[in-house]
Amino acid sequence: MDPEETSVYLDYYYATSPNPDIRETHSHVPYTSVFLPVFYTAVFLTGVLGNLVLMGALHFKPGSRRLIDIFIINLAASDFIFLVTLPLWVDKEASLGLWRTGSFLCKGSSYMISVNMHCSVFLLTCMSVDRYLAIVCPVVSRKFRRTDCAYVVCASIWFISCLLGLPTLLSRELTLIDDKPYCAEKKATPLKLIWSLVALIFTFFVPLLSIVTCYCCIARKLCAHYQQSGKHNKKLKKSIKIIFIVVAAFLVSWLPFNTFKLLAIVSGLQQERYFPSAMLQLGMEVSGPLAFANSCVNPFIYYIFDSYIRRAIVHCLCPCLKNYDFGSSTETSDSHLTKALSTFIHAEDFTRRRKRSVSL
């Protein structure tokens, strides 16, 4: 198969290729011109408001700031940058794929989307590693889990994400077809296909494996603590549920789209086409909006399941409730988990040392 004939769009935003087959596939999806503008508008309004409130509540909250809050603020900023580009895509979907806002915004908006995708995945990975260190290795990780280290890590993530977005910036162009403008990707070359495959593996599937591994280790440690204590600790049981909810939300949001993208790249590298381009394109069109919606749901997830953030948001919106402490009975912050697991680990170490001394 000649890569020049590859018709499946390989970047993070799917339905903008000038290939006639793509336009035909896109036009046969009935919901795009009606449902997507409405859906993206709702995502834009709720996401912009939610992420602004989340950033403001954590940034201006008096007192000490949790280490995890630094990552959450950066994640909200990354989502916010993506969300401000959504009105451009609302206009594109409403105009049946036409791009009416010029070449600069064609390249710039696609670049910001790519930066957001990489930044979000890397930040989620760092948050998972941070929680792993805080819960599983609380004593050893004290010298690493510092505020200055968190800021350096976040700055590095932004820098790397901006570099990884450059291929998207260079491969995008405003193309005229039948005197109609389309924000499109250039023809796929063998080098681009290989780069897309390597980038997808190392910027999604490897971080995904890291996230799942970290949370599995955390869940194992929590279960061990629960069995060791022999108490029905509702806080720890709820913490395990939250861990799986976070992982499940990440998987539901991103795994379908990136799986179709992986199949598209592999199909483009094969001599024979094993997967129809129309099927892969349709899969990315259906799963793409689900992935993008993740940018607006994160503030609500944190508000519902993290009582620390819930209090910060309520105190930010209603300063009169500053002295009213609620939700403490369902606290699920990392500080609670760290204290509980630290006690458990110290008890385990003490038991081992005692057994060793007795045996000697």
UniProtKB/Swiss-Prot annotation:
The keyword Phosphoprotein applies. It comes from Macaca mulatta. GO terms for molecular function: coreceptor activity; G protein-coupled receptor activity; virus receptor activity. Residues 55-69, 142-149, 214-239, 306-360 are cytoplasmic. Coiled coil: none annotated. Interacts with adapter YWHAE; this interaction promotes ER-to-Golgi transport of GPR15. G protein-coupled receptor that plays an important role in immune homeostasis. Acts via its natural ligand GPR15LG, a chemokine-like polypeptide strongly expressed in gastrointestinal tissues. GPR15-GPR15LG signaling axis regulates intestinal homeostasis and inflammation through the migration of immune cells. Controls thereby the specific homing of T-cells, particularly FOXP3+ regulatory T-cells (Tregs), to the large intestine lamina propria. Also required for skin localization of thymus-derived dendritic epidermal T-cells. The chain crosses the membrane at residues 34-54, 70-90, 121-141, 150-170, 193-213, 240-260, 285-305. PROSITE patterns: G_PROTEIN_RECEP_F1_1 (PS00237), G_PROTEIN_RECEP_F1_2 (PS50262). Its main location: membrane. The modification Phosphoserine is found at residue 359. It is found in: Cell membrane. This is G-protein coupled receptor 15. It holds the Pfam family 7tm_1. Residues 1-33, 91-120, 171-192, 261-284 are extracellular. Belongs to the G-protein coupled receptor 1 family. It is a multi-pass membrane protein. Phosphorylation is necessary for YWHAE binding and efficient surface expression. O-glycosylated. Sialylated O-glycans in the N-terminal tail inhibits binding of GPR15LG. The lineage of its organism: Eukaryota, Metazoa, Chordata, Craniata, Vertebrata. It comes from the Eukaryota. SMART domains: 7TM_GPCR_Srsx. GO terms for biological process: angiogenesis; G protein-coupled receptor signaling pathway; T cell migration. GO terms for cellular component: endosome; plasma membrane. Keywords: Cell membrane, G-protein coupled receptor, Membrane, Phosphoprotein, Receptor, Transducer, Transmembrane, Transmembrane helix.
